[in-house]
């Protein structure tokens, strides 16, 4: 199964801006690896909350549409809220 997430590049980084994103219903994330420079991104929480329940989500390539360009990634790590059904942050690795 293929998964697609639409994302935007983040201009602000840090704890305060990440908290503002989460309150706005977005998830801060980063894409890194493969000798490329790390890219900070953000996307809607609802675009990942349901698809992350599938087991193959963590083992398959995911397409991120980042500012109009398609990027193939894999989930490296995901931080979840302690008791709420919320994703706090996602680390993606270039596929």
Curated annotation (Swiss-Prot):
The keyword Ribosomal protein applies. GO terms for biological process: translation. InterPro entries: Rbsml_bL25/Gln-tRNA_synth_N (IPR020056), Ribosomal_bL25/Gln-tRNA_synth (IPR011035), Ribosomal_bL25_short (IPR020055), Ribosomal_L25_dom (IPR029751), Ribosomal_uL5_bac-type (IPR020930). Gene3D superfamilies: Ribosomal Protein L25, Chain P (2.40.240.10). This is one of the proteins that binds to the 5S RNA in the ribosome where it forms part of the central protuberance. GO terms for molecular function: 5S rRNA binding; structural constituent of ribosome. Part of the 50S ribosomal subunit; part of the 5S rRNA/L5/L18/L25 subcomplex. Contacts the 5S rRNA. Binds to the 5S rRNA independently of L5 and L18. It comes from Shewanella loihica (strain ATCC BAA-1088 / PV-4). PANTHER family: RIBOSOMAL PROTEIN L25/GLN-TRNA SYNTHETASE, ANTI-CODON-BINDING DOMAIN-CONTAINING PROTEIN, RIBOSOMAL PROTEIN L25_GLN-TRNA SYNTHETASE, ANTI-CODON-BINDING DOMAIN-CONTAINING PROTEIN. It comes from the Bacteria. NCBIfam families: PRK05943.1. Belongs to the bacterial ribosomal protein bL25 family. One of its GO terms (cellular component) is cytosolic large ribosomal subunit. This is Large ribosomal subunit protein bL25. Keywords: Ribonucleoprotein, Ribosomal protein, RNA-binding, rRNA-binding. It holds the Pfam family Ribosomal_L25p.
């Amino acid at each position: 199964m293929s998964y697609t997430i639409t994302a935007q590049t983040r201009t602000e980084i840090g704890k305060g801006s990440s908290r503002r994103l989460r309150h706005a219903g977005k998830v801060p994330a980063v894409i890194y690896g493969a000798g490329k420079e790390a890219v900070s991104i953000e996307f809607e929480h609802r675009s990942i909350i349901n698809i992350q329940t599938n087991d193959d989500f963590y083992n398959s390539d995911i397409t991120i549409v980042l500012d109009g360009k398609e990027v193939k990634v894999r989930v490296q790590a995901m931080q979840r809220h302690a008791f709420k059904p919320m994703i706090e942050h996602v680390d993606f690795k270039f596929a």
